[in-house]
Amino acid sequence: MSLNFRRGVQSLLTLPFRKTLESQETFESGTKIRHYLRENGQEKSRIHLRLDPGGEGTLIVNASSVMRLNPTAAFMAWLILEGTEEKKAVKALRDRYRVPEKQAREDYSSFALHFSSLTDGACPIHELELDAVMPFSARPTAPYRMDLAITYRCNNDCAHCYNARERNFPELTTEQWFGVLDQLWDLGVPHIVFTGGEATLRNDLPALIRHAEANGQITGLNTNARRLMDMDYVKELVDAGLDHVQITVESCVPEIHDEMMRAKGAFCQTIAGVNNVLRSPLYVMTNTTMLRTNVHTIPATLDFLADLGVPTVGLNALIYSGSGLTVGTGLRESELQPILNIATQKTGQRGQRLIWYTPTQYCEFDPTANNLGVKGCTAALYSMCIESNGNVLPCQSYYHPLGNILTDSWDSIWNHKLSVQLRERQSLPAKCEGCPVVAECGGGCPLTAEGYRKENLVNLPVVH
């Protein structure tokens, strides 16, 4: 036990973290969020340590794994990340907490072991949704991820799109977006995802990525990848510092993909983009919305993506927002099980990772029972969205502005009545009262119930 224990500490300390900010003299001084980089050959880990005013901290690894830290643990994490020798770290603990040397050394070694397992085992930035150690128990003062809908313009016209804005919706200037990125960094937001609309239609996207990278933020792109068919453009995004990309592929059947996109020829351009990013250093995943239009092609689509070499595939149900409220092709939660069983089997056989995004009512579909992880609504908690005009939304499909990032205080946005209502699960269905898994389930997506009422879905069988 002690030998393995020592190996855990040693493996951590022999792969030093490179600080991307100037070294801080003390634990208390410096910025609210600190960014560290650890490189081991071609592998790279990006660690963010976010410190709260009360001394508590949050350790975020590759924007996917999260560990909430009490003040003592936050201090020990800082010691490790700063590259402090174990002997000096133990002395610092003794001086700070007035504890015996034996206790300080044991506590530090124990924490270092847990720390090492988290940082060594964290999946690179594939899971774009938060995977909290204690699901939904943490109450941060700002989200860990912010989606930036930098434009609502798009070169597709998806019939099921959750976008509820006009395509000519006002847009911030490049300089204004720079200011937003700086403000988010000061708030302690380490993960930025550029989305839309279609974010690649903004010519300043590489500049925005470069600015976020200079701050220390991890950056991702949600895209239809049509512009990524240009390899020179892909290289420009990579050189700017882009970390990961998620590409929408609705079907392996070109006619069905193009029908859902309402854009003839979109499939060929998207797949060309997929092939380009797979040849780049980017972390790559795809996402597919399961509808009655394409559900019969999902098994073949999964095989197609595996043959392309896509390492991670995401699936989600219809989002009941924007055109999704009226498209009439959504599946009931109770219909998801058979197709997700197939997806789990196929991705497992091909060595891929499967990500399921949609928060569901666990009494209708329980993702934990299907080895898909805890999925609950994280709106106004772990993730939020800023629209192209600066309005802040609970999430990118919940079109009820909480304020504007340029004109309203963050405190008023974070503590808006709707923000609190969503975080504290204050509007759950009556049947959820007393449920033992309500903390994880959260009653499912708050937009789905309204969508069911408007769509008046009937329980149709899933086509296999």
Name every feature range the model reports, one short phrase each.
Residues 150-157, 380, 432-439:
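Cysteine-centered iron-sulfur cluster-binding motifs in ferredoxin-type domains/subunits
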Residues 2-13, 18, 65-147:
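Long, charge-rich, low-complexity alpha-helical segments
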Residues 123-143, 359-366, 401-427:
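Short, charged low-complexity linear segments at domain edges
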Residues 105-129, 348, 386-414:
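A broadly conserved sequence feature marking short terminus-proximal activation segments
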Residues 238-240, 248-250, 255-393, 397, ...:
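Radical SAM enzyme [4Fe-4S]-AdoMet core and its adjacent flexible, acidic
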Residues 1-78:
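Acidic, low-complexity/disordered tracts enriched in E/D and polar residues
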Residues 41, 392, 397-464:
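Flexible mid-to-C-terminal extensions adjoining Fe-S/redox cofactors in radical SAM and related proteins
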Residues 88, 96, 102, 106, ...:
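Conserved alpha-helical substructure of the radical SAM core
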